[in-house]
């Protein structure tokens, strides 16, 4: 099961949530510039939260479901209905020895791989299921679903 999405690349290191929102909104037929979404999400140099993103899309007239403790089963069910989920994940930087937060759009699960649109590279990438689950769990399994 896979939802076809148009990837966008984030223009700043802290606009991953905003760019994920742009990807999902584009799939719903709405084209918003990154700067407008960043402002609506109250984005600052530390980024934006999925909760802020949910409030922003509601103010734009969309329905949003912020899931503070989503499950893999919930994620799978949304995908089966053709709805991608924005999730927060932990990303390790072994060079600098730090872990940072990042957001990606989960658009599919196939053959033990989770397919995500990663705004850091502006493209799809595949993650091993266990790698994805570990990274997602480290950010409390947060998710955001946007609907018309």
Short names for language-model regions:
Residues 1-47, 71, 86, 91, ...:
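Active-site-adjacent structural segments surrounding the nucleophilic cysteine of cysteine proteases
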Residues 55-81:
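Helix-adjacent hinge/juxtasegments
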Residues 25-30, 58-62, 137:
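Sec-exported extracytoplasmic/periplasmic mature domains
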Residues 43-48, 80, 90, 97-98, ...:
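Noncatalytic regulatory segments and standalone regulatory/sensor domains
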Residues 101:
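Short coil/loop residues immediately preceding or within conserved phosphate-binding loops
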């Amino acid at each position: 099961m896979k939802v076809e999405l148009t990837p966008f690349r984030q223009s700043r290191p802290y606009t991953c949530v905003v760019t994920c929102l742009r990807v999902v909104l584009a799939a719903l037929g709405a084209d918003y510039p990154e700067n407008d979404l960043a402002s609506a999400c109250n984005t600052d140099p530390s980024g934006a939260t999925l909760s802020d993103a949910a409030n922003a899309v509601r103010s734009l007239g969309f329905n949003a479901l912020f899931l503070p403790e989503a499950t893999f089963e919930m994620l799978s069910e949304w995908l089966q209905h053709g709805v991608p989920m924005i999730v927060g994940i932990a990303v390790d930087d072994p060079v600098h020895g730090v872990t940072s937060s990042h957001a990606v759009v989960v658009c599919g699960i196939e053959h033990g791989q989770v397919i995500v649109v990663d705004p850091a590279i502006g493209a799809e990438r595949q993650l091993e299921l266990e790698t994805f689950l570990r990274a997602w769990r480290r950010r409390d399994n947060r998710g955001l679903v946007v609907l018309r």
